[in-house]
Amino acid sequence: MFTITSYFGFLLAALTITSAIFIGLNKIRLI
């Protein structure tokens, strides 16, 4: 169960970072 929780946390962190980078690129392109 611990491994599943850590994997889910890692996946969530990766998704958050990817979204932040994607939004950042969109803002740069918008400017």
Swiss-Prot record:
Main location: plastid
Pfam families per record: PetL
Compartments in which it is found: Plastid, Chloroplast thylakoid membrane
Domain of life: Eukaryota
Transmembrane segments: 4-24
Keyword annotations: Chloroplast, Electron transport, Membrane, Photosynthesis, Plastid, Thylakoid, Transmembrane, Transmembrane helix, Transport
GO MF entries: electron transporter, transferring electrons within cytochrome b6/f complex of photosystem II activity
GO BP terms in the entry: photosynthesis
InterPro entries the UniProt entry points to: Cyt_b6/f_cplx_su6
Bilayer topology: Single-pass membrane protein
Record carries keyword Membrane: yes
Cellular component GO terms held in the UniProt record: chloroplast thylakoid membrane; cytochrome b6f complex
Quaternary state and interactors: The 4 large subunits of the cytochrome b6-f complex are cytochrome b6, subunit IV (17 kDa polypeptide, PetD), cytochrome f and the Rieske protein, while the 4 small subunits are PetG, PetL, PetM and PetN. The complex functions as a dimer.
UniProt function note: Component of the cytochrome b6-f complex, which mediates electron transfer between photosystem II (PSII) and photosystem I (PSI), cyclic electron flow around PSI, and state transitions. PetL is important for photoautotrophic growth as well as for electron transfer efficiency and stability of the cytochrome b6-f complex.
HAMAP family: Cytb6_f_PetL
Family the entry assigns: Belongs to the PetL family.
Protein name per Swiss-Prot or TrEMBL: Cytochrome b6-f complex subunit 6
